[in-house]
Amino acid sequence: VFIDEMPWIDTQKSDFVSALENFWNGWAARRSDIVFIASGSATSWMVDNLIENQGGLHARITSSIYVRPFTLHEVEEYLQRKHCKWDRYQILQCYMVMGGIPFYLSLIDPRQSLVQNVDRLFFSHSGIMRGEFDELYNALFSNAELYISVVKALAQHHDGMTRTEISKVIGVNGGTLTRVLTNLERCDFISRSQNFGCKTKDTIYRLMDFYTLFYYKFIAQDTS
């Protein structure tokens, strides 16, 4: 049994997780001919509801695989297989726009230059990537506006921000902010670092998602 993008099934009032618990514990777990594979791009949902589940699915995971985006080298190999004749500088620029997300890279037309591809995908009225930002955050997070407010603040501070600084900008603190920062980190949108000898409150959060950085530098001001 293979379910792709499982988090999308768990809609409000669906009781999907409870149903999955009953399916596995009440029937599938006793069978030797069942292999159950679940995948999803909403990392925070997968961790909370499957990997770190404290209910009926606790300790039911045999193995987990976190599929990371392509590295810069892997992006180069992928584009070469698409017969892109770009030099390494263009490939680097492409990586800084799209990151290592295979779906984004699959949209590239190798017959066009990087500039032509970016213009077609991001800035034309019918561009596939034109509305990707809102769709992405709304698909991954409930209360997406709160998550967007955090990445927007971080996009304006390339040296990073402390939790206290983020809280002052977005007006949220406590457990809510902790959950938002944790989920953004799980999904590789942000990173955190702490200098040796510094206290936890001095932890620095930085925006690291290339597409989000590109969006706030070029697309947000264009669409507004």
Where are these regions (language model features)?
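Phosphate-binding site recognition
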Residues: 1-224
